[in-house]
Amino acid sequence: MKVAVLGAGAWGTALAAHLAVRHDTLLWARDAALVAELAVRRENARYLGGVALPPGLRYEADLATALSHAQADDALCVIAAPVAGLRALCRAMRDARRVPAHFVWVCKGFEADTRRLPHQMVAEELPDHASYGVLSGPSFAREVAQGLPVALTVASASAACRERTLAAFHHGAMRIYTGDDVVGVEVGGAVKNVLAIATGIADGLGLGLNARAALVTRGLAEMSRLGVALGGRAETFTGLTGLGDLILTATGDLSRNRSVGLQLAAGRSLDDILAALGHVAEGVRCARAVLSIARERGVDMPITEAVCAVLFDGVAPRDAVSGLLRRDAKAE
């Protein structure tokens, strides 16, 4: 199978490495210097240092060439750009008249200014296309690149897209599940990043494992309430893309969003944290959108409110936790 992966960050590189073991895989990056470096070193030192890339993986800086690689009906395109770059890539595909027959995206979050989920952006930019979906689940790029076991879900309204994605990814140590609840999968992937910041704050303050368990559990309730309000199915949030992704991102030491929370608890400013991080922390990007949508829909999300208060309103992390503890008692 021919597969094109658009985006050579950590996640795009890891997925391309997995795909190249079995398929004719092309990894596209906008930065020609990075493409040249990848071809020579067989390693993405910028985003995934120390991981040797498969000898069969090829690299490309020209987007039209990369898209042409995935045009056939038996091919697949994987968009591994962050949420902020998804719309632009869809426009580029449309303008080049090279929209792949089947494609999936792996970004998580809401578009900051429009509050759109990824599938809404895709539908707006490519209204005549139907065979697309989202691939998501509890996964750290480095572990995937190292060939460690992982389980992901592809959600799409198109059976052809689900089948093509399954055929591409389901091999080696990667297990793929399929479904059609695109909204539920995307909401889970967005909200878990915000909740991971909360868990990082609690852990950074030394509040203990009891507090962590409470935050994860009540955070899952917030995620589910919002997802159902937006049209997702409740059962999706107890699966890989809801509870599974939340547990990993909230507790795993490779989580960028958890790291933001830990550093906020240590007294560092958000600007300094993001500058030092050097990579995307989607929980920071989409926290405002999540809270805004929740308020608009009448969905109670106190943990998300507390995170936004710390990130954007200057509330001290310990004061935000105290505010949560002072909330009125209620039935679970």
UniProtKB/Swiss-Prot annotation:
Q: Does the keyword Magnesium apply?
A: no
Pathway where it operates: Membrane lipid metabolism; glycerophospholipid metabolism
Q: Where does NADPH bind?
A: W11, R30, K108, A141, R256, V280, E282
PROSITE patterns linked to this entry: NAD_G3PDH
Keywords assigned by UniProt, alphabetized: Cytoplasm, Lipid biosynthesis, Lipid metabolism, NAD, NADP, Nucleotide-binding, Oxidoreductase, Phospholipid biosynthesis, Phospholipid metabolism
Q: Which GO terms describe its molecular function?
A: glycerol-3-phosphate dehydrogenase [NAD(P)+] activity; NAD binding
Pfam families, per database record: NAD_Gly3P_dh_C, NAD_Gly3P_dh_N
Q: What superkingdom does the record give? A: Bacteria
Binding sites annotated in the UniProt record for sn-glycerol 3-phosphate: K108, G137, S139, K192, D245, S255, R256, N257
Primary localization:
cytoplasm
Output the GO biological process annotations, alphabetical, semicolon-separated: carbohydrate metabolic process; glycerol-3-phosphate biosynthetic process; glycerol-3-phosphate catabolic process; glycerophospholipid metabolic process; phospholipid biosynthetic process
Its Enzyme Commission number? 1.1.1.94
Give the location in the cell.
Cytoplasm
Reaction catalysed by this enzyme: sn-glycerol 3-phosphate + NAD(+) = dihydroxyacetone phosphate + NADH + H(+); sn-glycerol 3-phosphate + NADP(+) = dihydroxyacetone phosphate + NADPH + H(+)
Q: Which GO terms describe its cellular component?
A: cytosol
User: In the UniProt entry, which residues are flagged as the active site?
Assistant: K192 (proton acceptor)
Q: Kindly give the InterPro entries that the UniProt entry links to this protein.
A: 6-PGluconate_DH-like_C_sf, 6PGD_dom2, G3P_DH_NAD-dep, G3P_DH_NAD-dep_C, G3P_DH_NAD-dep_N, NAD(P)-bd_dom_sf
Q: What does this protein do?
A: Catalyzes the reduction of the glycolytic intermediate dihydroxyacetone phosphate (DHAP) to sn-glycerol 3-phosphate (G3P), the key precursor for phospholipid synthesis.
User: HAMAP family recorded for this chain?
Assistant: NAD_Glyc3P_dehydrog
Database matches in NCBIfam families = PRK00094.1-2, PRK00094.1-4
Family note: Belongs to the NAD-dependent glycerol-3-phosphate dehydrogenase family.
Name of this protein: Glycerol-3-phosphate dehydrogenase [NAD(P)+]
Gene name of the encoded protein: gpsA
